[in-house]
Amino acid sequence: CDRRQRQMCIRDRSINERFTDSQTEKIGIRSLKIINKPDKDGKTFYVELNGQPVFAKGANYIPQDNFLPRVTEERYRKTILDAVNANMNMLRIWGGGIYENDLFYDLCDQYGILVWQDFMFACSLYPAEGEFLENIRQEAIDNIKRLRNHACIALWCGNNECNDAWFNWGWQRRYTQQ
């Protein structure tokens, strides 16, 4: 993964040409596509990074501790470096966990680890209307805005095991029996 990062500084000028505010952010610029096209076996599913096909090797990442404040910077660094040393280039943030803190994404940017970011909706059926749907929409907006400058974010995904539960785990049958 291309690890080049840039710093962008935005400054706000008042009418008298004095700077009134500024903000500096690290940003990563890259092109990433998920290639899904027909082939002899059905359909492809691979990552193309800056025009080059990439074999995604990685792991499913869950929260490191039930008590989140116990996860130290050293533990985050060790986790990401362990992934790098295992020749991984992608981690999937499990939708039953949490949106990780900024350090996690900063380290992934630094070490070239792509992130398959689940939205935090897993293993259940969720209402798809009204206030709950608006809450989901706002959660997506807030987290995409928060993480959008990280080059490590490869894709956003949702609905972890929700359809599987309905169609394959007997949820549909149990629901209709009630």
Where are these regions (language model features)?
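Single conserved hydrophobic/aromatic residue that forms the stacking wall/gate
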Residues: C1-I10
